[in-house]
Structure formats: C-alpha cells, structure tokens
C-alpha cells in the first residue's frame, strides 16, 4: 500500500502530535487484525516536541540523580519545590506556616491523604496552572471508591523512561522502534477501557491496553493468535491479570513482566518466572503519586525510583520513624503540575533502609512493603471478576464507604455507608446491578450501615475481601 494511505488525520495528530505514517499503519494493524479484541476507546500520548525533549532530560536525571539520601530533612531540591509552590497552592500555604524552617522543622508540616484529593483537589491545583493540557485519570478503585486525579500528558509519559530504567536494572536494554509492539497492558476485568496506540518516547513503537476476558475476543483462540502475532517486547499488568493469562496459556515470550496495582506474592512470582522464563519486576505505583519504587534485582526491597520524589515512613502523628522501623509510606514531590504532593500518606506501610545495596542502586529501599493484597472474585459461572469491576458498579450509588466480601461458596455480602440517610440507597437496585455483573445466579445480601467504619482506627474499612485464593 502507498505511504499516503497512512497519513495521520487531524484527530490522530491531536492525540499523537508526533505520529508518523508508520505509526498510523501500526495502529491500523493492531486495531483491524481479525483476532483483535473489542476496542472501545481511542487514545494517544499527546507528547509534542518540547515534551519529548523534557522526557529525555528526565531519563538522564533518572541515571545521574541517584545520590544517597539520609533520614531527616528532604533534599534541597524538594524544599525548593515546596517553597516555590507554597504561595501558588492553597493546600501548601495552609500546611506550611509562614517562617517555618523546613530543613529543621519538616515534621511540623501536616500530612495529607487520599481524602484531600477526593474532597479538596481544587486546593492542590496551582492557582496559575495552565489547564490547556489537563487530563483526568480515574483511579482503579482497588481501595474503595475511585478518585478523579488531574494529570498532564508529559507527567504521564514519564512512566516510559522509568519503565525503561527498571528494565535496565534487570539487564534488559530494549531498542524500541516503529513497527514493533513495545508493551501490552494486560487486564482481566468484566469491562475496562481497551485501545491500541503508539508512543513517541519509544520511537513510535506500539502499545495496547488489552482485556483478556474471553467475552472480549472474536473466538476462544483469538487471544492466543493475537499475542503471538504482535509479540509485545514486555508486558505490564496486575498479579490477578497475569495469573489469569497463565491459566489461559496465552503463548507470549516477553522480555519481562512488570506487575503493579496490588501486592505480588512470592509463590505467584516464581510461577510466572518459570512459565514465561523472564524476570518479573514488581512495581510500586499509585495513580496519585506515579511510580514510587521498583523491586531490587537482588531481592532487597523496593528502590525509590524517581529522583524527584521524597519518601518518608511516618507514624500516626506524622513523625518520621527511625530507619528500618515500620511506618506509613509518605511522599512529597513528583512531576504532575496539576497535583503536587506534600507529605502524602499512601496508605501503605513499610520500613525505609538508607544503607548501601548490593545491586548498586544508591536510592533508599522500602522493605517489607505492606501494599494492597490481591483480591479475586468469581462469577457463579466461573468467569473472573476484578474488584475494579465492583467499584465501577458501586460508584454509581451515593456511598461514603463499603465492604464487599465473597465467600468460598461464591455468595457475597455487601455493607455500605450511605452519604445521606439509610433510605438514600436502594438496596434492591444495588443487588440488580451486582447480578448484572456477576450473573443472575449470584446470591448477595446488602446491608445499610450508617456507622460503618466508626469503630475502627481512622474510620477505615476493608473495601474488598474474598475467601477465594489467587492461583499460584
């Protein structure tokens, strides 16, 4: 076919400003393949020439900015960032008293949490922010109701140099180019956004977010043929999705698997490594913070990955715990211009080690990370149901908190705390929507509990629990 047939349209250039005819051809090939899954979205990196320069500079700083850090006050560049943002970010000006000496009084700054993003995001966006490039991400909802997180294309694209850096630490040095698929993000959900695109930072190589739910494919054999045809260089996904991929025996030979979103068990990690004969790199990341750490190649915890993020372990009062003592992982900094973070409590716990690591990376390590445990649900018919799918159903109702549990016999129980009174939530409608997701055979009880969480420390609930075990 003539190259002119692959000239990008105006809409393509809006989504992918640097796309070339080869990129158009790649997207068309992925999208129109006879075994392609059901696509329901179109997306691009929105990266322009200035963004690409900034991404390459960020990649260089990932290598050169890895100086050893000490417990106590943050490095000077973090203090400079906070000082620069204080008059422009309402939340910062409220938290940092005038005249506070941050080098010696850092712990006097009040911490922030997920709740600040949920109900007061307008206090976090700088007053002078240029909103022309604003995009909004919705968190997966693995810890409860999803958050709406303001984001920027350049900040989102920084994931790519960080992924490349982590791959390099495992001896993998990819040479991405047009015409190849660099990465596929594997999901196993009842419904999720799915699309193919190309990424400018990776030289126009292909990328796809794919749902391996069998109902999303033309035939039972289609995912096997599709993965074999496009042979992605590496894969990303959560442990639940990789476990399901392994169960489906999809023939793929990735250079690495990068797991994220929920905790990866040692048993599943070993089985994935044996099955796919490649490194399994556990990745600690939140939508609000971006990537925080990657698993040390020598097995010594998680190295803090980005140089522009300051990580603490703090107690309930916001005081730093001693090195190697357990505390809540709390972060400051990042590169999202629409969501600067100041002592943001992640809700995850671990111990910080500032000592030298045998792998050679000088950045601090998070030891014994207590992240989000993987939770698996099954429909009565046997299909997998991801907690994200349940979140998508429940977010349509006026709820403050919820606890959803599936028993070993596949029956379910849901307790909810409504925003208003007990009559503000229609239990019958909740049951109908859950049956639409799980199937009409689902046995489920819904209980309205206006004081759910009140008797627990911090008012926290456990949104998802399951008596089913993730296959390892």
Q: Where are the model-predicted features located?
A:
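Nucleotide 5′-phosphate-binding alpha/beta core
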Residues: 1-138, 145-176, 231-236, 251-252, ...
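Conserved adenylate-forming
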Residues: 2-5, 188-307, 389
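Conserved S/T- and glycine-rich ATP-binding loop of Class I adenylate-forming
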Residues: 85, 139-142, 183, 235, ...
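Residue-level recognition of short loop/turn positions
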Residues: 143, 315-317, 381, 458
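Carboxylate/His-rich catalytic cores and anion/metal-binding grooves
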Residues: 167-190, 194-196
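Conserved beta-strand segments of alpha/beta enzyme cores
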Residues: 206, 279, 310, 403, ...
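AMP-binding/adenylate-forming catalytic core of the ANL superfamily
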Residues: 235, 335-442
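Conserved AMP-binding/adenylate-forming
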Residues: 264, 268-356, 375
């Amino acid at each position: 076919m003539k190259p002119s047939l692959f000239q990008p349209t105006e809409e393509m250039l809006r989504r992918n400003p640097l796309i070339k005819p080869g990129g158009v051809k790649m997207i068309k090939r992925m999208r129109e393949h006879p075994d392609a899954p059901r696509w329901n979205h179109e997306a691009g990196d929105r990266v322009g020439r200035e963004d690409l320069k900034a991404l390459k500079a960020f990649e260089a700083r990932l290598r050169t900015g890895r100086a050893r850090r000490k417990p106590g006050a943050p490095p000077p560049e973090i203090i400079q960032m906070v000082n620069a943002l204080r008059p422009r970010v309402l939340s910062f000006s409220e938290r940092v008293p005038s005249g506070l000496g941050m080098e010696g009084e850092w712990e006097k700054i009040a911490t922030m949490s997920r709740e600040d993003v949920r109900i007061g995001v307008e206090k976090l966006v700088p007053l002078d922010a240029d909103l022309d490039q604003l995009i909004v991400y919705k968190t997966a909802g693995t810890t409860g109701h999803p958050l709406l997180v303001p984001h920027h294309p350049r900040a989102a694209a920084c994931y790519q140099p960080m992924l490349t850096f982590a791959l390099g630490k495992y001896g993998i040095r990819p040479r991405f180019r047009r015409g190849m698929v660099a990465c596929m993000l594997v999901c196993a959900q009842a419904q999720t956004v799915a699309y193919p695109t190309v990424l400018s930072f990776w030289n126009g190589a292909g990328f796809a977010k794919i749902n391996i739910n069998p109902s999303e494919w033309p035939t039972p054999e289609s995912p096997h043929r599709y993965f074999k045809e496009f042979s992605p260089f590496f894969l990303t996904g959560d442990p639940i999705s990789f476990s399901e991929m392994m169960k489906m025996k999809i023939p793929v030979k990735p250079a690495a698997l990068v797991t994220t979103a929920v905790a990866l068990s040692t048993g599943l990690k070993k089985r994935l490594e044996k099955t796919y004969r490649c490194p399994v790199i556990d990745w600690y990341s939140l939508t609000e913070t971006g990537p925080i750490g990657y698993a040390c190649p020598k097995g010594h915890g998680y190295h803090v990955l980005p140089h522009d993020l300051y990580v603490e372990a703090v107690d309930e009062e916001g005081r730093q715990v001693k090195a190697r003592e357990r505390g809540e992982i709390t972060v400051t900094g990042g590169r999202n211009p629409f969501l600067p973070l100041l002592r943001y409590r992640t809700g995850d716990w671990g111990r910080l080690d500032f000592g030298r690591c045998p792998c050679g990376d000088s950045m601090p390590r998070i030891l014994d990370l207590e992240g989000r445990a993987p939770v698996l649900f099954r429909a009565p018919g046997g299909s997998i149901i991801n907690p994200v799918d349940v979140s998508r159903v429940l977010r349509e109702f006026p709820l403050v908190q919820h606890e959803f549990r599936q028993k070993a016999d596949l029956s379910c129980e849901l307790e909810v705390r409504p925003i208003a009174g007990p009559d503000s939530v229609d239990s019958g409608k909740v049951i109908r929507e859950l049956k639409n997701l799980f199937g009409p055979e689902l046995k489920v009880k819904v209980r309205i509990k206006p004081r759910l969480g009140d008797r627990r420390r911090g008012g926290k609930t456990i949104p998802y629990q399951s008596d089913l075990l993730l296959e390892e």
